[in-house]
């Protein structure tokens, strides 16, 4: 379920994540929020190993916030994977000391596959293309980044702003 009021975010360098069980699609934008670029997908390992790679991306790109996709169903309700994504996003944001925002990623992988001809891709290119779509969506619709601590108590059932 999407929130009624949307606050369009201030432009800043952001890292977008499409969190999956095997890979995390990654995309970033320039500090003005004009150019969105897919980045090489991260093949999942232990959280500490993921954190090293993601911290490096954040430092080299001067990232000021994270956007994490939440897979909601067609009715806007959280899926089982949404809770995994929420926990991962909060843990990552807290570890990096960055604010974050959630974006409804319903159909983002399908849309990315259609847009870029990547249906069935297993290399991670599709995951990162989906992360780029999430970031484009966030830049247009918000919501504003919030401290991870304010999201830590989330159950995955509360509404999120932005998204389609």
UniProtKB/Swiss-Prot annotation:
It comes from the Bacteria. This is Putative pre-16S rRNA nuclease. Its EC number is 3.1.-.-. The lineage of its organism: Bacteria, Bacillati, Cyanobacteriota, Cyanophyceae, Synechococcales. HAMAP family: Nuclease_YqgF (MF_00651). It comes from Synechococcus sp. (strain CC9902). SMART domains: YqgFc. Belongs to the YqgF nuclease family. Disulfide bonds: none annotated. Its main location: cytoplasm. Keywords: Cytoplasm, Hydrolase, Nuclease, Ribosome biogenesis. InterPro entries: RNaseH-like_sf (IPR012337), YqgF (IPR005227), YqgF/RNaseH-like_dom (IPR006641), YqgF/RNaseH-like_dom_sf (IPR037027). GO terms for molecular function: nuclease activity. It is an enzyme of class 3 (hydrolase). It is found in: Cytoplasm. Pfam families: RuvX (PF03652). One of its GO terms (biological process) is rRNA 5'-end processing. Could be a nuclease involved in processing of the 5'-end of pre-16S rRNA.
């Amino acid at each position: 379920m999407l929130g009624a009021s949307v606050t369009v975010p201030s432009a800043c360098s952001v890292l977008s994540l499409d969190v999956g069980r095997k890979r995390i699609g990654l995309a970033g934008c320039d500090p003005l929020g004009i150019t969105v670029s897919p980045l090489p997908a991260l093949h999942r390992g232990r959280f500490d190993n993921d954190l090293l790679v993601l911290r490096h991306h954040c430092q080299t790109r001067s990232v000021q916030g994270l956007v994490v996709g939440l897979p909601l169903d067609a009715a806007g309700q959280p899926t089982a994977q949404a809770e995994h994504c929420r926990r991962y996003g909060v843990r990552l944001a807290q570890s990096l000391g960055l604010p974050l925002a959630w974006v409804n990623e319903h159909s983002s992988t399908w849309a990315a596959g259609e847009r870029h001809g990547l249906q069935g891709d297993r290399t991670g290119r599709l995951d990162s293309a989906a992360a780029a779509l999430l970031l484009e969506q966030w830049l247009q619709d918000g919501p504003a980044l919030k401290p991870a601590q304010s999201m830590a108590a989330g159950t995955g059932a509360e509404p999120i702003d932005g998204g389609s």
